[in-house]
């Protein structure tokens, strides 16, 4: 069974001059379109999590929700939002795929490799890793961790994904650097323009409404 997914679009990026960086163009498409093209064939359903105006996201035909817990508590709040949404929408679902909104080169076998790492390393959570380090916002999470995550976020500031997953067995799935390249600054975007994202059919155009 393919997992549901949440794209962590978060909020505005000050290092990119404000605004939602997921709409920045790369190879004639916004970053979020590249991510949807990669993730849609690998998942059963996709949620976009953002605390910005939802209107610009609606054109992509996916549900859009803000953080379930107010206070801008970072990616963990978005992950919790995805878990709660997935449990309601897919009661039999076991895992949730999480991806950041600024990684346009995600591979077509992202989910398969995360599942492989999860099984082989007998872990609770699987996250992506490259020679540059780990990428904990790109991973597979058991949706039944929602109650614990919600409790921890409500009890005190646990803003670091690395900090929170320290209490679990975590598997790392290895990828090439370019597969997980993320765009945080104008220089990052300029560097990524020297690479071409895979030429994928825009599967999200026929995705769930």
Language-model segments: residues:
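Nucleotide and nucleotide-moiety/phosphate-recognizing core
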Residues: 1-158, 164-179, 187-190, 194-205
């Amino acid at each position: 069974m393919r997992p549901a997914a949440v794209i962590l679009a978060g909020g505005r990026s000050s290092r990119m001059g404000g605004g939602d960086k997921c709409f920045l163009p790369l190879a004639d498409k916004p970053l979020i379109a590249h991510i949807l093209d990669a993730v849609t064939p690998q998942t059963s359903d996709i949620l976009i999590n953002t605390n910005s105006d939802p209107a610009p996201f609606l054109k992509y035909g996916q549900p859009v929700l803000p953080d379930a817990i107010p206070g801008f508590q970072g990616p963990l709040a978005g992950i919790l939002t995805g878990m709660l949404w997935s449990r309601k929408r897919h009661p039999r679902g076991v895992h949730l795929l999480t991806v950041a909104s600024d990684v346009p080169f995600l591979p077509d076998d992202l989910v398969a490799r995360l599942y492989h790492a999860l099984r082989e390393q007998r872990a609770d959570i699987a996250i992506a890793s490259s020679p540059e380090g780990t990428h904990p916002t790109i991973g597979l999470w058991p949706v039944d961790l929602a109650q614990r995550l919600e409790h921890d976020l409500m009890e005190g500031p646990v803003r670091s994904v690395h900090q929170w997953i320290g209490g679990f067995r975590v598997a790392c799935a290895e990828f090439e650097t370019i597969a997980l390249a993320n765009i945080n600054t104008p220089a990052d975007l300029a560097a990524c323009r020297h690479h071409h994202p895979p030429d994928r059919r825009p599967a999200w155009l026929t995705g769930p409404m």
